[in-house]
Design a protein with these regions (language model features):
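Short, structured secondary-structure boundary patches
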Residues: 148-150, 275-282, 373-374
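Glycine-rich phosphate/ribose-binding loops and adjacent secondary-structure elements
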Residues: 2-4, 159-312
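Surface-exposed alpha-helical segments enriched in charged/polar residues
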Residues: 116-119, 151-154, 158, 181, ...
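C-terminal extensions of enzymes
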Residues: 1-30, 34-43, 133, 297-383
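Residue-level preference for long, well-ordered alpha-helices that form the structural scaffold
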Residues: 107, 138-149, 172, 207-214, ...
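Short, solvent-exposed loop/turn segments at secondary-structure junctions
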Residues: 41-42, 66-68, 98-100, 132-134, ...
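Non-catalytic, usually N-terminal nucleic-acid engagement modules in DNA/RNA processing proteins
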Residues: 1-160, 382-383
Length: 383
């Protein structure tokens, strides 16, 4: 597909000794260069905060859906281009908004309309208009969604004017393998491949009969896509927390996006390194509030909201103001990504992930991931 030529390249720089699929690499897009693993902070184009006005941000994701639904924003983005509209000179992915269209039960979105928006707004990368699967739908409806995604992929990859990311989906390893094969028939070796339909598995399928362990299925799915596209950067869509971020990175995911920093702030939560969601003030409603050890972490936070303030001032501001929580949360997300990258390069990635994931919801899933690593190593020795 000629639209990729000379615009995007992805080259391995470092592979971890313990996790066979984990790597750091260089991604080059439109003469911009960045180290993986990546974290794209989701941003709503017409709303504050603009995080890059508060601290250094390299990568942002916006949604075509959010732009199309607001005519004023659409016109301005198309006139100025998305970088100038946002006042941001880093890398921007524009997602097609397939997940949002799914929630509205809209399957008749015209991929050519999305292509036109991409061409006029000029993000660094676009995403093929995909129709994510729904784990609660019947199999035929999900097959219909994949066929529409495949049709869109063929049309958009052949006619797009900017680099586009194809996305694979599947709620069984057999279906996911077929999805990978279908995309390879269009583009055998895309520089970037996306894995979608992950978010509904986490939030809709806990305890379901079909997915007795949805997170372990996600782990297996990530491994399959990495093996099917070993030379492609792997992006997984819609990761919510820093702990899920570390789990995905430890599996060999090269790139993630998250709106979690904003959504958690909207619910009144803040993030802290290595800790789950916390509410700044204990309101006796059963929600997890700051412990004494959490307060110690908060007292040394250097985010733009917390710096130069007493602990009491930090707690009061984070409890009362959404924007302050959002900026603080995004800072923690970025710092956790940067720390992971540092640990990867100095050879302590395993110890770091083990520390971050040893407690909480993802601890047993990290153990499952480690068991699979051991099995892979034994198989390679036997061969």
């Amino acid at each position: 597909v000629s639209l990729w030529n000379g615009k995007v390249s992805f080259e391995d720089q470092y592979v971890d000794d313990i996790f066979p699929l984990v790597r750091s690499a260089k991604l080059k897009i439109n003469k911009k260069e960045i180290d993986t693993p990546l974290l794209w902070l989701g941003h709503l184009p017409s709303l504050e905060p603009h995080l890059w006005n508060h601290f250094d941000v390299e990568t942002v994701m916006v949604s075509a859906y959010e732009i199309i639904r607001n005519r004023r924003v659409y016109n301005e983005v198309c006139e100025k281009g998305i970088h100038k509209y946002l006042g941001f000179d880093g890398l921007i992915i524009m997602d097609s908004g397939g997940f949002s269209f799914q929630k509205k039960d809209e399957l008749d979105v015209d991929p050519e309309d999305i292509l036109e928006l991409y061409e006029m707004s000029k993000p660094d990368l676009g995403v093929v208009l995909d129709h994510p699967l729904n784990p609660l739908e019947d199999e035929m409806k999900n097959k219909e969604r994949w066929l529409k995604t495949l049709q869109n992929s063929d049309l958009m990859l052949k006619n797009g004017k900017i680099p586009l990311i194809p996305v694979v989906h599947g709620y069984s390893l057999e279906d996911l393998k077929k999805s990978c094969d279908d995309i390879k028939n269009i583009h055998e070796n895309p520089p970037i491949i996306g894995l979608g339909s992950i978010v509904p598995l986490i939030f809709k399928c806990r305890g379901s009969k079909k997915f007795k362990n949805s997170v372990n299925f996600i782990i297996d799915s990530v491994r399959m896509v990495r093996k099917e596209f070993p030379d492609s950067l792997l992006h997984v869509f819609g990761i919510g927390s820093t702990k899920s971020m570390h789990l995905m990175y430890s599996l060999g995911v090269d790139s993630l996006d998250s709106m979690g920093w904003r959504l958690k702030a909207a619910y009144g939560c803040i993030q802290l390194p290595g800790v789950g969601d916390r509410y700044p003030v204990n309101k006796n409603n059963g929600r997890p509030s700051l412990t004494e050890s959490d307060k110690e972490l908060l007292s040394v936070c250097e985010c733009p909201i917390c710096e130069d303030k007493s602990l009491e001032e930090r707690i009061r501001l984070l409890d009362s103001d959404f924007k302050s929580r959002a900026i603080h949360n995004a800072w923690v997300f970025i710092c956790e990504r940067d720390l992971y990258h540092q640990k990867l390069l100095d050879g302590s990635c395993f110890d770091f992930c083990n520390e971050r994931l040893k407690t909480g919801f993802f601890s047993k899933h990290f153990s499952y991931a480690l068991q699979e690593v051991v099995h892979q190593r034994l198989d390679s020795v036997n061969i």
